[in-house]
Swiss-Prot record:
Belongs to the class-I aminoacyl-tRNA synthetase family. The keyword S-adenosyl-L-methionine does not apply. This is Arginine--tRNA ligase. It comes from Burkholderia ambifaria (strain MC40-6). Keywords: Aminoacyl-tRNA synthetase, ATP-binding, Cytoplasm, Ligase, Nucleotide-binding, Protein biosynthesis. GO terms for molecular function: arginine-tRNA ligase activity; ATP binding.
Length: 593
C-alpha cells in the first residue's frame, strides 16, 4: 500500500473509531483513541490490510470486540473517501478488521513510480535533521579485512537508507592512530627495512607478518611519497634508525592503501577523524579533568577509575593505568564529546560485536560529564564475524595481509580473479572489480548484522538463481531486454506507457507484483527507523521473485495493445524500483547480463 493511501486509510479509520466511541459513550465522554496500526495479513486470502483496533477498544469501551469491529467497518465504508480505497471489509476471529483494496488503489503504484522515478520510495519527513554515522574506523596498521568490509557495507547502505528519509547524513571514519599497534607497525617496517623477515632471528615478536610490510619498507627506503586523501604528503626518509619517521610514513602509506580499498568498494567518507588529534589538542586530558571534577572518578592501586557502575555498568573501569597511559575507551569518550559539540544529537556507530563491552563505558563517561548528552547516546549497530569459504574450505590467509582475508581479496575473487592473481593487480580489469564489488556489497548486507555470515566465493561466482545478487540483477536486465524488444517490435517507448489501461492487470501474479512495489517506501522507512539495512536486500530478492512469477505467468509481448502496454508498464515500474533499491545498496543495475 502506498504511503499516501495508508495515511488516508489510517485517518478514515481513526474518524470511524471516534464516531463509534461517541455513539457508545456520548460525544462529551473522555476518550483516548489508540493509534491505528495497519498491517499486511500473512495469508493473502485474508485481504490486503488488517487492523486490530476493535480489540484494543473492547475494554475501554466495554463492548464486544467483534461487534465493535462491525460498527467501525460500517462507519468506515459510509465515508465517501473510503470508497475509492476499500473494495470490501470482513471481520475475522475475535475482531480483526480485514480490508480489501480497490483495483485502482493497487494499480496506483505504477503511476506513482512513473511520476517519481528515482525519488520513488524516498521521503522528506526528516528534512532538516542530521545524523553522524561512524563506521569502518580501522587501525591504520594493515589492509582492510573482511570484517571491515561487512562494516563498510552496513554503514554505507544504512547511510543511504537514512538519507532516503530526508536526513543529512555525515559519514565519518575514526582512525585509531595513537595506540600500541602503531608502534608495532613501526618496528615491523623497521625490521623489514633491515632485511629481516618473519621467522628470522631478531624478528620482533609483536611484528606484523604480511607482505605489505615489505612493500612499505621498500618504498620508505626508496624515499617514495605517499598521502591519504585528507592528509599531507609524507616522503620516506630512508633512515632505518629513525623510528618516528618510519611510523609516520607507514601510517600514511596504509591510510592511502585503505583509501584504495574503500574506493574499490564504492565507499566515501565526509570526514576522517584522527585519534592522535584528541591528544595533540588536549581533548583527552580535558575530558579526564572534567570527570575528576564531576566526582566520577577515584584512585586505587595507583590507577584512576571511572565510576561506571553509577551509570549501569557491571563494575567500575580503569581510565588511567598505573603507568600513566589511558585505557582505550578514554579517547573514545573524548571523541564522542566532539560529536556532540559539533551539533550531532543523533550518532550511530557501527562496530564489531567484540566492542560490546565498550558501550556501557563510553555512555557512562558521557553521562558523567553532565553536559546534556542524553542516555543511550550514541546508538550502536554491532555486527558479527565473517567467514570466507572457497571450494568448500575456509580461507584464512591472504598473501597481502599474511593472517587474514582482505576486502580487496574478496572483491577480486568474487569478480572472477583467479587465486594468486591479486599479486598482479594490473591484470584485473574494471569489469572484474565491478562484479566483485556488487557481489560483496550485496552478500555482506544480506543478513542481519547480529548474525554470523559465511561468504561463499563459489556462490558469488554462480550465474544462476542460487546467487542472490545475480538473481536480482538478472530481473532488471531481463526487463530491460523486454522493453527494448517492445520498442523494436511494436515501436512503443517507455515514455508512452503511463497512458496504459492498467485495468488489464487482473491476474494474481500482477496484483501481487503491484503490492510488492507499493511496499518499497514503507520498507525504507522501517529500515531507517530500525537501523536495519538488510531489509533492502531482503525486499529486492522478494521483488525479483514476484517479477519472475509474473513474467512466467503472463506473456508481455503480445499483439493486443491494451494488455501488452499494461504489462509493459508494470515491468517498467518494476525495473525502476529494482534500480532504486540496488542504488541504495551501492550495487549496479546492468541492462545486459
Amino acid at each position: 500500500m502506498l504511503p499516501a493511501h495508508k495515511q488516508t486509510l489510517e485517518a478514515l479509520l481513526a474518524d470511524s473509531v471516534t464516531q463509534v466511541a461517541h455513539a457508545l459513550k456520548g460525544a462529551d465522554a473522555a476518550f483516548v483513541a489508540p493509534a491505528i496500526t495497519l498491517e499486511r495479513p500473512k495469508v493473502a486470502a485474508h485481504g490486503d490490510v488488517a487492523c486490530n483496533v476493535a480489540m484494543q477498544l473492547a475494554k475501554p469501551l466495554g463492548a464486544n470486540p467483534r461487534q465493535l469491529a462491525e460498527k467501525i467497518v460500517a462507519a468506515l465504508t459510509a465515508q465517501p473517501a473510503a470508497q475509492g480505497l476499500v473494495d470490501a471489509a470482513e471481520i475475522a476471529g475475535p475482531g480483526f478488521i480485514n480490508l480489501r483494496l480497490t483495483a485502482a488503489a493497487k494499480q496506483a503504484v505504477i503511476a506513482a513510480v512513473f511520476e517519481q522515478g528515482r525519488a520513488f520510495g524516498t521521503s522528506d519527513r526528516k528534512k532538516g535533521k542530521q545524523v553522524l554515522l561512524e563506521f569502518v574506523s580501522a587501525n591504520p596498521t594493515g589492509p582492510l579485512h573482511v570484517g571491515h568490509g561487512r562494516q563498510a557495507a552496513l554503514g554505507d547502505v544504512l547511510a543511504n537508507v537514512i538519507a532516503s528519509q530526508g536526513y543529512a547524513v555525515h559519514r565519518e571514519f575514526y582512525y585509531n592512530d595513537a595506540g600500541v599497534q602503531i608502534g608495532n607497525l613501526a618496528i615491523s617496517t623497521q625490521a623489514r627495512a633491515r632485511g629481516l623477515k618473519p621467522g628470522d632471528a631478531g624478528w620482533p615478536e609483536a611484528a606484523y607478518n604480511g607482505e605489505y610490510i615489505a612493500d612499505i619498507a621498500r618504498d620508505y627506503l626508496n624515499r617514495e611519497t605517499v598521502a591519504a586523501k585528507d592528509g599531507e604528503p609524507v616522503t620516506g626518509a630512508g633512515d632505518i634508525d629513525d623510528l618516528d619517521a618510519i611510523r609516520k610514513f607507514a601510517v600514511a602509506y596504509l591510510r592511502h592503501e585503505q583509501d584504495m580499498d574503500l574506493q574499490a568498494f564504492g565507499v566515501k567518507f565526509d570526514q576522517y577523524y584522527l585519534e592522535s588529534s584528541l591528544y595533540s589538542e588536549g581533548r583527552v586530558e580535558k575530558t579526564v579533568d572534567a570527570l575528576v571534577k564531576a566526582g566520577m572518578t577515584y584512585e586505587q592501586d595507583g590507577a584512576l577509575w571511572l565510576r561506571t557502575t553509577d551509570e549501569g555498568d557491571d563494575k567500575d573501569r580503569v581510565m588511567r593505568k598505573s603507568d600513566g597511559t589511558y585505557t582505550y575507551f578514554v579517547p573514545d569518550v573524548a571523541y564522542h564529546v566532539t560529536k556532540w559539540e559539533r551539533g550531532f544529537t543523533q550518532v550511530i556507530n557501527i562496530q564489531g560485536s567484540d566492542h560490546h563491552g565498550t558501550i556501557a563505558r563510553v555512555r557512562a563517561g558521557l553521562q558523567g560529564l553532565h553536559i546534556g548528552i542524553p542516555k543511550g547516546y550514541p546508538d550502536y549497530v554491532l555486527h558479527k564475524m565473517v567467514t570466507v569459504m572457497r571450494d568448500g574450505q575456509e580461507v584464512k590467509l591472504s598473501k597481502r595481509a599474511g593472517s587474514y582475508v582482505t576486502v580487496r581479496d574478496l572483491i577480486e575473487w568474487s569478480g572472477g580473479a583467479a587465486p594468486g592473481q591479486e599479486a598482479a593487480p594490473d591484470l584485473i580489469d574494471e569489469a572484474t572489480i565491478t562484479r566483485g564489488r556488487d557481489a560483496v556489497r550485496f552478500f555482506l548486507i544480506s543478513r542481519k548484522a547480529d548474525t554470523e555470515f559465511v561468504f561463499d566465493i563459489d556462490l558469488a561466482l554462480k550465474q544462476n538463481d542460487e546467487n542472490p545478487v545475480y538473481y536480482v540483477q538478472y530481473a532488471h536486465a531481463r526487463i530491460c531486454s523486454v522493453l527494448n524488444e517492445l520498442k523494436s517490435r511494436y515501436n512503443v517507448d517507455v515514455a508512452q506507457l503511463p497512458g496504459a489501461d492498467l485495468a488489464q492487470l487482473t491476474s494474481p501474479q500482477a496484483v501481487s507484483l503491484m503490492q510488492k512495489l507499493a511496499e518499497y517506501p514503507d520498507m525504507l522507512t522501517h529500515a531507517a527507523k530500525e537501523l536495519a539495512p538488510h531489509a533492502v536486500a531482503f525486499y529486492l530478492r522478494d521483488l525479483a521473485g514476484e517479477f519472475h512469477s509474473f513474467y512466467n505467468a503472463e506473456r508481455v509481448l503480445v499483439d493486443d495493445e491494451a494488455p501488452r502496454n499494461a504489462r509493459a508498464a508494470l515491468l517498467a515500474a518494476t525495473r525502476q524500483v529494482l534500480e532504486n533499491g540496488l542504488a541504495v545498496l551501492g550495487v549496479s543495475a546492468p541492462a545486459k547480463m
